[in-house]
Design a protein with these regions (language model features):
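Hydrophobic, membrane-embedded alpha-helices of multi-pass small-molecule transporters
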Residues: 99-116, 220-224, 234-303, 330-355, ...
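Transmembrane helix-loop boundary segments of multi-pass membrane transporters
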Residues: 123-135, 204-216, 335-339, 369-380, ...
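Loop-to-transmembrane helix boundary motifs in multi-pass membrane proteins
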Residues: 213-216, 348, 364-397, 439-461
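TM-loop-TM module centered on a large, flexible mid-protein loop between adjacent transmembrane helices
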Residues: 296-350, 368, 389-397, 401-405
Length: 511
């Protein structure tokens, strides 16, 4: 039957009345071998055999009924991963899986035009000069990427996806709240990436009368020679400090945005992989593209500040228009347009992790959602991304700034709670995690402390945030335009609240 095979036991040995039926499976007990040597997961079902032809026919019909849905059959045919949020056992790991794979994946995901566009916000939105923008980019990127590298170690050690791991770190209830937020974040990142690519594609061939409409769209080689780049004036004072904090919040949000994805991409590494090697390889893989792209974006923006023509392109199509101005007119012309298309396509590398993790996060929200194949969640996530990206194209600057800051807020809270649990209550030891409890509500931490910390931290964020739609009472005290300290207040309030309540949760509930 293609996907089904049968083996009859010798009736001269014990348990000879058992018949073994092998069918592909993504649930229950699995083993990664197949009778034809393919990579199909198989489930063994034992049935009593009366050695009659009728029973053989019944076994065949029963096995056919247990075959995979057509989605998973297709995924199996394409050699795609179909495993859900269940822990990845040591026997399922890939002995050839290298830290270079994870490091290069994050390198590709961040060497994209969205990071470049974010760097341009420093001079264009926050009125910072190039030197100040570079310092902010380096410091806040380091602050944001360290949790990503650190939580990647957990995936290799425990074999748990990040949102399932969160049940141990945040508590069961809190983890499901963050799983929902993570689904929203996956779509949001996809929108941000798609928007800036659409803006760039919109500029290609725009002088020929055949420009690509904005909704359908879904590097500086000559700055020094053109004399359009300058460092800008060094300024100080409360207003500059406020702008530094606000730009830093956006940078931090971009860098740390992968924190709730981290363990998803190391679960197939052998457990004995050197943990220091994982950490520092990922730090390198994350830091270089983030530094390079954002600093390049800041330099490009400084050129727009000094050149009226470039500024006009920027005003028309934001960073996409500015990139076109640098690469095409009076520069590389046709080849420059080709480069613009390549840059726009870099979005694919950034969106792959989003659409991979969105399915795992959706399944982690609720048990019933785990029964829906991952491919369905991924398709739904892509559809939502397109639907939101189209209107967001026309309001990119405000959307990107607000979204990045919002991501930074909730991830700072997540990191503060998770690190508290691991270092204080689990004594920085992986031996204090019982992986078998991953889906047992009676044994997992309830999440009282985590939920309380999240709620209290939200008030801290509200007091410290500085957005076009809301300026907190504390943030408005910093400079003329306010300074965003929402993620700092959120993290600190979450840490304090969690460590006040968590001991009582352990004392009275024992978990």
């Amino acid at each position: 039957m293609g996907f089904t095979s049968f083996m009859k036991r010798d009736h001269s040995v014990d348990n000879s009345d058992l018949e073994q039926v092998i069918v592909p499976s993504i649930n229950s007990e699995e083993k990664n071998t197949s009778t034809d040597g393919s990579n199909v997961d198989e489930k063994i079902i034992y049935r009593y055999d009366t050695v009659t032809a009728d029973d053989d026919l019944y076994a065949i019909e029963s096995a056919i009924e247990t075959k995979l849905s057509w989605f998973n059959r297709l995924a199996t045919y394409l050699n795609a991963e179909t495993k859900g949020i269940e822990p990845v056992g040591e026997d399922e790991r890939n002995p050839d899986e290298s830290v270079v794979n994870a490091s290069s994946m994050w390198f590709s995901a961040n060497m994209v035009i969205a990071a470049y566009a974010l760097g341009g916000l420093g001079p264009m939105i926050y009125q910072l000069n190039f030197g100040t923008s570079v310092l902010v980019i380096i410091f806040f990127n380091i602050l944001g990427l360290l949790p990503v590298a650190y939580f990647s170690i957990f995936g290799c050690e425990l074999g748990l996806r990040q949102m399932v791991l969160s049940r141990f770190l945040l508590g069961n209830l809190t983890a499901r709240i963050f799983a929902l937020i993570n689904v929203v974040a996956c779509v949001g990142w996809g929108v941000v990436n798609t928007v800036v690519s659409a803006q760039l594609l919109n500029m290609v061939n725009h002088t020929s009368g055949h420009e690509m409409p904005l909704w359908a769209g879904f590097i500086i080689a000559r700055l020094a020679k053109s004399h359009k780049f300058s460092n800008g004036e060094w300024t100080s004072g409360p207003t500059t400090a406020g702008n530094v904090l606000s730009f830093g919040c956006a940078v931090y949000g971009f860098a740390t945005g992968w924190t709730t994805y981290a363990a998803d991409y190391t679960v197939y590494m052998p457990k004995n992989t050197n943990k220091y090697k994982i950490f520092f390889s990922l730090v390198a893989g994350l830091s270089f593209p983030l530094f390079f792209c954002m600093i390049l974006g800041a330099a490009s923006a400084m050129g727009a500040v000094n050149d009226p023509t470039w500024n006009q392109y920027y005003q028309k199509n934001s960073m996409g228009g500015l990139t076109y101005a640098i690469l095409v007119p009076d520069s590389l012309h046709g080849f420059g347009q080709f480069c613009c298309v390549l840059l726009a396509m870099s979005t694919v590398a950034n969106n792959v992790p989003n659409m991979y993790t969105i399915a795992l996060s959706a399944q982690a929200m609720w048990g019933s959602f785990a029964k829906i194949p991952r491919v369905i969640w991924t398709l739904a996530g892509n559809a939502a991304t397109i639907a939101i990206a189209i209107p967001a194209c026309y309001y990119f600057e405000g959307f990107m700034q607000n979204f990045m800051d919002s991501i930074g807020y909730y991830l700072a809270i997540y990191t503060a709670i998770a690190l508290s649990e691991h270092f204080i209550y689990r004594k920085n030891s992986f031996n204090n995690y019982n992986i078998e409890d991953w889906n047992d509500n009676s044994k997992l931490p309830i999440g009282i402390a985590g939920t309380a910390a999240f709620i209290v931290a939200a008030f801290g964020v509200a007091l410290g945030m500085c957005q076009t739609y809301w300026v907190g009472e504390i943030s408005r005290l910093i400079g003329k335009f306010g300074g965003d300290i929402g993620f700092e207040l959120g993290a600190s309030w979450a840490f304090i609240t969690y460590n006040i309540i968590r001991p009582f949760e352990i004392k009275y509930f024992g978990r």
